[in-house]
């Protein structure tokens, strides 16, 4: 530095001299920069570049500036004050901090120890004046962060505490301690010990005068303006006073709900609770809560060991023993008990809990009803037995009524259908031109053909025995009636499913009738208890009856299906027999097949329709439809709509084939439907054909003996002659019977006398019909020749 000073002086003297050769400022700057680069000198230039300063001088100037500012200065302010770049200032400050521990930097500010000590000294002086200071107020006052200020205060307090613990060094350290006898509460408030003592005595005075429970927060708010109480300090000191028994009482609750309860109040309260409990054998939680006890359940449980906690009250166990003794009595006598007179005014839930704690209730020999009645199980069982017997009698009566109704309906339908069956049997093989057609189920195809006049005179069993036809028809009528009854039952079942039978009203009435002295509330409660049992018993009875009826119905349906199948095959075999007869007649047809076409149409309109209807009924039974029979085309269409789509279409084709003139389309459609219905069709063999011919012949002979109408007698004679000599049966309407006569006349194997008499008989019949003399055959038929011919054929047939 001395050399530098010498050089500076030389430079100054040279510059002062008048010389023609002088260095410019630029040259001087370049020389200095070169010397700095060569590390010949260590200097720092100012911000304007016109001045230079050494690092040592910079440190000195920083110290001077700190002293000038009272020990606290902002680092950024030094740049403008010293006109030195901030980087050089920060480097100089780091060196200063290492050498001088009293200097520290906090949030961009330089603070010295003596400055911080002055702050602590000022805090100490102010505390002695006011007694307490808040840390936030101090932070705002000194413009220092709260954390830094807290740390500063705590360090000083730690030194003070260590000095108290170390008495040997106490005198040496007291000089460095500025805060003495200070309490720093929760790093928020500074108190002097004298202030704490004054606050302590305020708490003693306030809470010693309290005789009623009061919230601690309310005490603080009421006396805040006058005593300036601190909530946290009050709680802490009050707890300490209670523990030291300086104040008689206790704190109940926490935080803002903390409540001070003086001992004098708790003692009088406990005395009242004890007196009420032992006099009444119970006490409610509400009454205890009104005495400012926050947890009455825990309080009562800890206070009285001979009681039981319920939902809303606390009772003495002697009440349970009293109720239990009465329960034993009603169990032994099969009676009931009303609890209301035996108990204090309790809630339903309390009574239920009392009953559940009775030992005899755990044996399941008694039950609680209506929340206040105990009734023995044996008494309940007796009531249920009586009710069950009553509803069983009711069920039997209803079942008997239904059976009578169903039986009556069946008898009526049997009677009506028997009349129809008899009419069918009479018109199966014998018709006259005067017979009026009747509307029947056997003919559901509308046609303009004249054959419709004769459709009603043919039945599905026309070629079987009369007795078999009657039995099968009557059995079918019975099955139809049972189907109707099943439909009724299904409707009833659907109604029952939608709305189940409830016997509550009936149970209530019966119990009131049987036990007149029983309380109305108990009657209602017992009815509600027995209600599901009685309803379930009723439902089981109904279910059992339904299952029985369903089993019978299924059995009947199965039998009916078997009968329908038997009828179908019998009718189908007759159809094959009639078809074979038409084929034999085809060879002798001499009118271009018109007669054959008419006979085939007649066969389709009669036997074909019956086969179709019978097949629909078989499928309706197979698919378990509610309605299996029908009387009109609309009813038949409704049944077909419930079949599977493919089967329904096949039936539509079968019905359409009935309106055609040939049998081939009908047979093809019939085979298709039978294949889908799992019905196997068989051809007519010789043995069965012969059997059918014999049966039809015997039936015609029997009808001939009982027939008095001449026209019908003639038709029977022609059919019998055709069966005898042609071994075939032609199913012909009356208007085409002449074709059969012509065929027989052309047969050379028949005796000429028979042919002659048959021809004359035909002529007489035609003559009578033409002259309208058959209107009253019993009185008007006086033709001797006609009677002679008929007598001849009668003898021939019978022999």
Curated annotation (Swiss-Prot):
Residues 469-478 have a biased composition (Low complexity). GO terms for molecular function: UFM1 ligase activity; UFM1 transferase activity. Coiled coil: none annotated. It comes from the Eukaryota. GO terms for biological process: protein ufmylation; response to endoplasmic reticulum stress; reticulophagy. One of its GO terms (cellular component) is endoplasmic reticulum membrane. The keyword Transferase applies. InterPro entries: Ufl1, Ufl1-like_C, Ufl1_dom, Ufl1_N. Its EC number is 2.3.2.-. Keywords: Transferase, Ubl conjugation pathway. Residues 458-468 have a biased composition (Basic residues). Residues 429-483 are annotated as: Disordered. Belongs to the UFL1 family. E3 UFM1-protein ligase that mediates ufmylation of target proteins. PANTHER family: E3 UFM1-PROTEIN LIGASE 1 (PTHR31057:SF0). This is E3 UFM1-protein ligase 1 homolog. It comes from Dictyostelium discoideum.
């Amino acid at each position: 530095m001395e050399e530098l000073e010498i050089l500076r002086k030389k430079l100054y003297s040279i510059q002062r001299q008048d010389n023609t050769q002088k260095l410019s400022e630029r040259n001087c700057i370049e020389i200095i920069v070169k010397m700095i680069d060569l590390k010949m000198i260590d200097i720092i230039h100012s911000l304007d570049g016109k001045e230079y300063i050494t690092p040592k001088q910079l440190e000195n100037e920083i110290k001077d500036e700190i002293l000038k500012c009272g020990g606290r200065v902002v680092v950024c302010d030094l740049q403008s004050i010293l006109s030195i770049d901030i980087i050089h200032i920060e480097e100089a400050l780091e060196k200063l901090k290492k050498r001088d521990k009293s200097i520290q930097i906090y949030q961009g500010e330089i603070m010295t120890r003596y400055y911080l000590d002055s702050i602590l000294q000022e805090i100490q002086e102010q505390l002695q004046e006011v007694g307490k200071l808040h840390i936030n107020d101090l932070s705002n006052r000194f413009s220092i962060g709260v954390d830094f200020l807290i740390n500063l205060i705590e360090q000083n307090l730690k030194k003070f505490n260590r000095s108290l613990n170390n008495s040997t060094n106490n005198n040496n350290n007291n000089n460095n301690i500025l805060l003495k006898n200070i309490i720093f509460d929760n790093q928020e408030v500074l108190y002097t010990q004298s202030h704490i003592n004054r606050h302590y005595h305020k708490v003693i005075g306030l809470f010693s005068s309290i005789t009623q429970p009061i919230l601690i927060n309310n005490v603080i708010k009421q006396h805040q303006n006058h005593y300036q109480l601190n909530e946290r300090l009050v709680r802490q000191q009050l707890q300490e006073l209670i523990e030291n028994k300086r104040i008689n009482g206790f704190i109940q609750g926490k935080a803002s709900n903390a409540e001070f309860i003086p001992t004098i109040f708790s003692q009088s309260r406990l005395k009242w609770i004890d007196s009420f409990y032992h006099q009444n054998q119970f006490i409610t939680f509400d009454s205890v809560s009104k005495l400012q006890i926050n947890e009455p359940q825990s309080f009562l449980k800890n206070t009285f060991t001979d009681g039981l906690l319920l939902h809303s009250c606390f009772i003495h166990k002697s009440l349970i023993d009293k109720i239990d003794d009465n329960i034993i009595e009603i169990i032994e006598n099969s009676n009931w008990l009303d609890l209301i007179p035996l108990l204090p005014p309790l809630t339903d839930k309390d009574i239920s809990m009392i009953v559940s704690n009775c030992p005899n209730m755990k044996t399941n020999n008694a039950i609680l009803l209506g929340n206040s009645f105990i009734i023995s199980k044996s008494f309940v069982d007796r009531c249920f037995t009586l009710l069950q017997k009553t509803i069983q009698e009711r069920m039997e009566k209803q079942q008997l009524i239904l059976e009578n109704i169903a039986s009556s309906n069946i008898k009526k339908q049997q009677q009506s259908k028997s009349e129809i069956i008899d009419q069918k049997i009479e018109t199966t093989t014998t018709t006259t031109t005067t017979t009026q057609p009747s509307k029947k189920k056997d003919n559901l195809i509308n046609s303009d053909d004249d054959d419709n006049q004769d459709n009603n005179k043919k039945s599905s069993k026309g070629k079987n025995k009369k007795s078999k036809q009657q039995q099968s028809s009557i059995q079918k009528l019975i099955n139809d009636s049972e189907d109707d009854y099943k439909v009724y039952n299904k409707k009833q079942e659907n109604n029952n499913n939608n709305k189940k039978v409830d016997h509550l009203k009936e149970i209530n009435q019966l119990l009131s009738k049987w036990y007149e002295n029983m309380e109305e509330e108990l009657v209602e409660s017992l009815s509600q208890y027995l209600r599901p049992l009685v309803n379930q018993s009723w439902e089981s009875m109904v279910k059992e009856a339904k299952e029985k009826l369903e089993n019978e119905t299924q059995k009947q349906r199965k039998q009916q299906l078997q009968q329908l199948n038997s009828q179908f095959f019998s009718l189908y075999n007759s159809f094959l027999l009639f078809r074979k007869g038409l084929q034999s007649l085809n060879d002798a047809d001499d009118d271009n097949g018109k007669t054959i076409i008419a006979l085939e149409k007649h066969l389709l309109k009669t036997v074909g329709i019956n086969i179709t209807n019978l097949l629909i009924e078989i499928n309706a039974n197979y698919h378990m439809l509610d309605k299996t029979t029908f009387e009109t085309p609309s009813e038949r269409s409704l049944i077909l709509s419930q079949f599977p789509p493919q089967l329904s279409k096949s039936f539509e084709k079968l019905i359409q084939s009935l309106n055609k003139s040939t049998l081939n389309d009908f047979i093809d459609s019939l085979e298709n439907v039978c294949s889908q219905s799992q019905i196997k069709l068989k051809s007519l063999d010789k043995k069965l054909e012969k059997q059918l011919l014999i049966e039809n012949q015997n039936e015609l002979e029997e009808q001939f003996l009982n027939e008095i109408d001449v026209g019908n007698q003639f038709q029977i004679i022609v059919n019998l002659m055709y069966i005898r000599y042609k071994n075939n049966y032609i199913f012909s309407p009356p208007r085409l019977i002449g074709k059969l006569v012509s065929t027989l006349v052309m047969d050379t194997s028949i005796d000429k006398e028979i042919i002659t008499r048959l021809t004359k008989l035909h002529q007489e019949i035609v003559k009578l019909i033409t002259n309208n003399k058959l209107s009253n055959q019993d009185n008007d038929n006086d033709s001797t020749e006609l009677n002679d011919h008929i007598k001849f054929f009668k003898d021939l047939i019978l022999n």
